[in-house]
């Protein structure tokens, strides 16, 4: 593993989002390989109906690649500035955390690379606090207009359902973890999909994300037809526009709102 000089990173803000590809054009005058995403585990304690990998998750992880190989290949990417860590649920397996997640986080920290982790934030709080200093963005999905929605959609792809009490405990833990981590300075970005399930509850969802969970950013992404989300209904273009107008009219103006993959504009 190459020893890299530790760089001082500027805080994530609406004026500094290193995951935006256009900044590569500004810096290098061309698109370049600047972001790598690692799937560190195929395990998860939930099975969300909207999850792109929810139907492919496993009950046992294969052996990971040796970290020496990963370090060597990362060293070959001179313009690497961001890293995304996802799963499954990256904080579910203690073995994976020790063998893969923490080594990746420490590598990124030493090299001055920004790190985003995709998590459901439902696991014991000490796991998140243990890695907090290495995380630039904690990304979560929050599409829950009601507790029933969390209990059904959040476990929609799970064959053997846990008891309702256990599901609701995870919901409370997610809210508490988000609030605590936000209070301690972690940048949490909560993503909400626009579909028929979230449409009636957009105001409630936004207020919960901003006021209860104290997230730094609320991402809005339209849901498009996909095999993995076939149980969820998409919005018409008219409904989508109305939903966006509703969010813009009632949003907390001190909170960063990020709208992505809108069908109204070309990518």
Describe the function of each predicted region:
Residues 66-70, 97, 101, 128, ...:
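Aromatic/hydrophobic pocket-lining residues that form the small-molecule binding cavity
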Residues 2-117, 122-127:
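Conserved alpha-helical substructure of the radical SAM core
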Residues 1, 6-12, 60, 75, ...:
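Radical SAM enzyme [4Fe-4S]-AdoMet core and its adjacent flexible, acidic
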């Amino acid at each position: 593993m190459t020893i890299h000089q530790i760089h001082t990173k500027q805080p994530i803000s609406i004026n500094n989002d290193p995951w935006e590809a256009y900044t590569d054009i500004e810096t290098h005058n061309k698109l370049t390989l600047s972001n790598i995403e690692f799937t560190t585990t195929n395990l998860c304690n939930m099975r969300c109906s909207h999850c792109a990998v929810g139907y492919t998750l496993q009950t046992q992880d294969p052996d990971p690649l040796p970290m020496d190989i990963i370090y060597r290949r990362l060293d070959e990417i001179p313009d690497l500035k961001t890293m995304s860590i996802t799963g499954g649920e990256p904080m579910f397996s203690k073995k994976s955390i020790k063998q893969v997640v923490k080594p990746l986080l420490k590598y990124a920290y030493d090299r001055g690379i920004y790190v985003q982790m995709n998590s459901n934030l439902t696991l014991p709080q000490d796991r998140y606090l243990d890695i907090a200093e290495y995380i630039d963005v904690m990304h979560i999905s929050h599409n829950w207009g009601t507790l029933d929605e969390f209990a059904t959609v959040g476990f929609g792809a799970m064959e053997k359902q846990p008891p309702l009490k256990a599901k609701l405990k995870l919901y409370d833990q997610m809210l508490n973890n988000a609030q605590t981590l936000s209070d301690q300075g972690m940048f949490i970005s909560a993503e909400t999909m626009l579909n028929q399930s979230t449409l009636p509850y957009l105001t409630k969802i936004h207020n919960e994300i901003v006021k209860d969970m104290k997230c730094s950013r609320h991402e809005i992404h339209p849901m498009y037809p996909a095999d993995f989300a076939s149980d969820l209904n998409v919005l018409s273009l008219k409904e989508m526009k109305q939903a966006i107008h509703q969010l813009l009219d009632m949003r907390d103006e001190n909170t960063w709102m990020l709208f992505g993959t809108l069908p109204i504009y070309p990518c």
